[in-house]
């Protein structure tokens, strides 16, 4: 069984984010029928019920650490997760999950992300360090690809 952990802004009833999750779950199940999916969620019970996946509390460091240790692959996305306009705290939350997975030798994919704006130099450097080590990056717009190129990260 191949274990995939999905990190994003899930379980908040945001229609766009939940649509991305539904599409991602469906696509993964079609392409990797023998996969086990776990989602980091604000409302794990609702996420389990809606999508038939395992779900854990997205703000529990212990639950996140366990989920990352168990996974073979982390998918971070979609949405506009990697930006510092709302706050650097949110950016560093998502980067910490990515970096922890990388530290443990997990495959890391950035999926359907709108990257930026990232205004602070320290945030740009932290983002570049994490994303340069990603196994794959797919952004959802040209502006995101341009920002990644600007900070030295190749994107598809």
List each language-model region with its residue ranges:
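Active-site-proximal region of nucleotide-activated glycan assembly enzymes
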Residues: 103-156
């Amino acid at each position: 069984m191949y274990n995939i952990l999905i990190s994003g802004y899930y379980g908040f009833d945001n229609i766009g984010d939940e649509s991305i999750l539904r599409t991602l779950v469906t696509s993964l199940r079609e392409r990797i029928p023998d996969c086990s999916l776990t989602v980091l969620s604000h409302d794990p019970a609702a996420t389990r019920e809606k999508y038939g996946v395992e779900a854990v509390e997205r703000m529990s460091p212990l639950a996140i650490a366990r989920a990352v240790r168990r996974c073979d692959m982390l998918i971070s996305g979609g949405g506009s997760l990697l930006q510092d306009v709302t706050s650097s705290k949110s950016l560093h939350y998502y980067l910490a999950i990515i970096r922890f997975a990388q530290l443990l030798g997990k495959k890391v994919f950035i999926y359907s992300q709108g990257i930026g704006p990232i205004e602070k130099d320290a945030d740009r450097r932290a983002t570049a360090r994490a994303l340069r080590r990603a196994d794959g990056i797919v952004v959802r717009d040209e502006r995101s690809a341009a920002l990644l190129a600007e900070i030295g990260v190749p994107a598809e």
